[in-house]
Amino acid sequence: MDNSAKDVSVRKALAWKALNSMDSIWTSSMKTELKKKFFISTVESILLYGCEAWSLTAAEEKSLNGTYTRMLRKATNVHWSSHTTNETLYGKLPALSNKIAARRLRLAGHCFRHPELSAQKLVLWEPTHGHRGRGRPKTNYVDTLRRDTGAGDSAELATLMADRKVWRNHVASRLRAP
């Protein structure tokens, strides 16, 4: 898979558009917890649509986390100059990059364990021939999965995905709040 920068920028723009269109909700006297639930069900779902297939660089993850924090601050009426920490702002919510990683891992596990499709070959496919151009290698899906799980190589990743209980624990560990 190729870099997902264009899709990420489109998702961010659509999420900002949705957030700004609901200004009357964010500025209302509604409870903060209710605003967060509404934010997650509307804006976050728009932002994370299709994120299971993204292979993000560290800079893109940082940009997404910052955008998400700014959006959450706007939704909860917490100004950036107020002395409210991100831990207080997020509360029990996990970081956005952890949510993306958990969704990515969940999809990869489903695809790998599907018996009828050759999706497991697609999930772990790496080119073995050809000439790579100059410069830094592009971030690919397998490397992203390895980074998310801490697996050393594709064989170790495959054994982790094959055991459903172990894989479920990897996914659940990503969703725990910091």
Residue ranges and their predicted role:
Residues 1-178:
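Short linear motifs embedded in intrinsically disordered, charge-biased segments
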